[in-house]
Amino acid sequence: GLPARGRGDGPDAAGNRRSVTLPEITVDTRPTQLFITLDRRTVSPNGDGRDDALQIGTITRRTDGAQSAELRIIDATGATVRRFPLDAVEADATILWNGEPDGERPAETAPDGVYTVEYRVTYDNGAVPVATSPSITLDTQGPSLGVDLQGLPFSPDNDGLNDELGIALTVEDISDIESWEFEILDRNRRAFQRFSGTGRPGARLLWDGRSSDGELVISAEDYPYRFTAVDNTGNASTIEGEIPIDILVVRDGNLLKVQISNINFAPNSPVLELDPDTPTGAKNIAVLDRLVEVFDKYRSYEIRVEGHAVNISGTDREEQDELQPLSTARAETVRAALIERGMDGGRIDTLGRGGQAPIVPHTDLDNRWKNRRVEFILLR
């Protein structure tokens, strides 16, 4: 600023000329530059140790003549969410914002959304310069997820109808997406197939019904899925559901067959649960009804119903005394249920196989549930 004195003269009210010397004044037109720096553009104050606070730096090129300063957090509507009055105006200062708004409950976090930082300094010459930061995102929530299964009923048996399942994944978040994973599980919630990636998923996944080891899904089984996405602040969301599998008629050598592990009997009994008001009964009814529909397309074939069991002890005694009679009786029960639904009993016979034809070793505790099944062999 440049000091200066002034003098003024002129007549007073009575017409007398008077002279007045003005006090010293300062003309201050120096520029007042302010700057804001941010250590990140996204803050996620949810206590997970990742991006929990925003470090804001202020730079004041001229501090002499500065009377006061204030930092403000501004939301997308222009409202001030948080004020940080600064007692002293320093050339460089650092403020941490952990997402808390002004108010009587500072433990709360401001709503997720887009904010800006505003820094203003008031000088004794009346100047009030203001610096505004680029936009920042406050994000404490995981992404909003959706799954749309396309091509149901899913029947990957190479008949040209619904052999591939389309899986449309949607991810909505105010932050960018860091990674995602879509897992398909078996009934014991062990990994069956997995898709994953970085960034947002593509518009649609295609699944051929096989596991990561090439194993085909089982008829009438419901495969759980788990969809997880993580945004770039570490917020994660997961949703779950099921992929229903249709009745599959697959070729095994020179034979066509249907293999089902999801026809459920009472424990150690050939009695089928057929109460429509129970989940097990409703599932059994749906499977049997669907079998009749499928076999109607193969009218030139006879059907052999085979019962299979798990030999837990691995002994001949269990095989002969328990499993052979039980698997035979269960096959007969299924045959009767098909006849009740309109199938010609003359084209259906039965065979109890016990534990003689396991899919996996009976000692495989994680997978031997697959051995307890009913197979339908299509014969000409």
Regions found by a protein language model. Give the residues of each.
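Extracellular Ig-like/FN3 beta-sandwich strand-entry sites
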Residues: 3-5, 66, 112-116, 177, ...
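Short, solvent-exposed loop/turn segments at the edges of extracellular beta-sandwich modules
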Residues: 11-16, 104, 122-127, 212-214, ...
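Extracellular acidic, Ser/Thr/Pro-rich low-complexity tracts
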Residues: 10-12, 58-65, 101, 123, ...
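Periplasmic peptidoglycan-binding/tethering modules of Gram-negative envelope proteins
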Residues: 28-44, 132-181, 193-201, 206, ...
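Acidic, glycine-anchored loop motifs typical of Ca2+
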Residues: 42-53, 99-107, 113, 153-164, ...
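Glycine-centered tight-turn motifs at strand-turn-strand junctions
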Residues: 1, 80-109, 191-217
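Periplasmic OmpA-like peptidoglycan-binding domain that tethers envelope proteins to the cell wall
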Residues: 275, 308-380
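Conserved structural position at the C-terminal beta-strand
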Residues: 8-10, 119-121, 227-229, 378
